[in-house]
């Protein structure tokens, strides 16, 4: 048999065998059998060496053409097999829409977020505008312009996170006061929610990061009575019950006079673990804005006065819901969080 006839017979036999191939493995085996180092085309290479010199070029071209033909068929078959395998895999993964669905647990607001939103909503209802200030603040805005002395303990690194010599993570949301008062003439009535950071030991009652709301009002003839009236209305709404307010003198650099704000406990002075058997719950620090803070902000304290109050959101959540450990808010324990969802 002439080489040309053998090549044609090889092509026909290959096509017959190729039609029986339906997997990548079988196709690989067929390719090795024909084109491998010990495959059928090896014998054509041997015959080419024995061929007369004047016929070698023609025979070589015929062998290469046959080999290319088989390689093209193998490539096309491989593509077809891959497509079929992908389609089969896709069908396996197809979703049966007739199957019953799996129940999904709906998400909900974190208890701290819920309380924060409630607090802000109450202040907005009382006529305050919502403003924000940055978490990263200059030492000047966080301390100096709020009347903190140079040697005040709060400025020390063991109480405050310093990013550099003049930049801190804010220790309170009071930094909004200077920013807002510097923008224009009173009246200004602002509530500012946000995160605060303090370099403290983490315990059941304190954390290095917490939420705070600052509310302040500056206008002509604002008095301590206005502050008391606002606080009474706020806490009555927040705790959803009638409350008594108790103001205790305290010291804060940015207010004068400064006061600690207590509200009557739900135990009605009978004494309980929540109020530590005192009948009162400490809820905020407040006071009349210090004249020097007004001056630092470009406001004339002879013409305008104002009050300010700052309250920790985690503390309010703990008091309202009887939570004993502030660390629970950060632990992502669903057994705890789902009680408030």
Swiss-Prot record:
It comes from the Bacteria. InterPro entries: aa-tRNA-synth_II (IPR006195), aa-tRNA-synth_II/BPL/LPL (IPR045864), Phe-tRNA-synth_IIc_asu (IPR004529), Phe-tRNA_ligase_II_N (IPR004188), Phe_tRNA_ligase_alpha1_bac (IPR022911), Phenylalanyl-tRNA_Synthase (IPR002319), tRNA-bd_arm (IPR010978). One of its GO terms (cellular component) is cytoplasm. GO terms for biological process: phenylalanyl-tRNA aminoacylation. Binds 2 magnesium ions per tetramer. Its EC number is 6.1.1.20. The keyword Ligase applies. It is found in: Cytoplasm. Its cofactor is Mg(2+). Mg(2+) binds at residue 256. GO terms for molecular function: ATP binding; magnesium ion binding; phenylalanine-tRNA ligase activity; tRNA binding. Keywords: Aminoacyl-tRNA synthetase, ATP-binding, Cytoplasm, Ligase, Magnesium, Metal-binding, Nucleotide-binding, Protein biosynthesis. It catalyses: tRNA(Phe) + L-phenylalanine + ATP = L-phenylalanyl-tRNA(Phe) + AMP + diphosphate + H(+). Coiled coil: none annotated. Tetramer of two alpha and two beta subunits. Belongs to the class-II aminoacyl-tRNA synthetase family. Phe-tRNA synthetase alpha subunit type 1 subfamily. This is Phenylalanine--tRNA ligase alpha subunit. The lineage of its organism: Bacteria, Pseudomonadati, Chlamydiota, Chlamydiia, Chlamydiales.
């Amino acid at each position: 048999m002439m080489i040309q006839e053998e090549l044609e017979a090889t092509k026909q036999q290959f096509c017959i065998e190729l039609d029986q191939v339906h997997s990548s493995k079988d196709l690989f085996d067929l390719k090795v059998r024909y084109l491998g180092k010990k495959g059928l085309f090896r014998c054509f290479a041997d015959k080419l060496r024995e061929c007369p010199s004047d016929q070698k070029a023609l025979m070589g071209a015929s062998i290469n053409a046959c080999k290319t033909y088989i390689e093209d068929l193998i490539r096309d078959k491989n593509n077809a097999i891959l497509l079929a395998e992908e389609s089969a895999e896709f069908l396996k993964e197809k979703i049966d829409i007739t199957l019953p669905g799996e129940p999904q647990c709906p998400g909900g607001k974190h208890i701290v977020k819920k309380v924060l939103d409630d607090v802000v909503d109450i202040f907005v209802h009382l006529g305050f505008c919502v403003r924000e200030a940055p978490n990263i603040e200059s030492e000047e805005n966080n301390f100096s312009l709020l009347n903190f002395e140079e040697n005040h303990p709060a400025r020390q690194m063991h109480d405050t996170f310093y990013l550099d010599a003049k930049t801190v993570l804010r220790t309170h949301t009071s930094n909004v006061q200077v920013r807002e008062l510097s923008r224009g003439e009173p009246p200004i009535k602002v509530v500012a929610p946000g995160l605060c950071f303090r370099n403290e030991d983490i315990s059941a009652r304190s954390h290095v990061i917490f939420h705070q709301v600052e509310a302040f009002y500056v206008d002509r003839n604002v008095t301590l009575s206005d502050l008391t009236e606002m606080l009474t209305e706020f806490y009555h709404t927040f705790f959803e019950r009638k409350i008594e307010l108790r103001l205790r003198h305290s010291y804060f650099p940015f207010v004068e006079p400064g006061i600690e704000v207590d509200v009557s406990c739900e135990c009605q002075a009978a004494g309980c673990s929540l109020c530590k058997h005192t009948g009162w719950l400490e809820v905020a620090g407040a006071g009349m804005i210090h004249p020097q803070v007004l001056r630092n902000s470009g406001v004339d304290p002879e013409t305008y006065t104002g009050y300010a109050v700052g309250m920790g959101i985690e503390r309010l959540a703990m008091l309202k819901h009887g939570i004993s450990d502030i660390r629970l808010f950060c632990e992502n324990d669903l057994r705890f969080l789902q009680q408030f969802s």
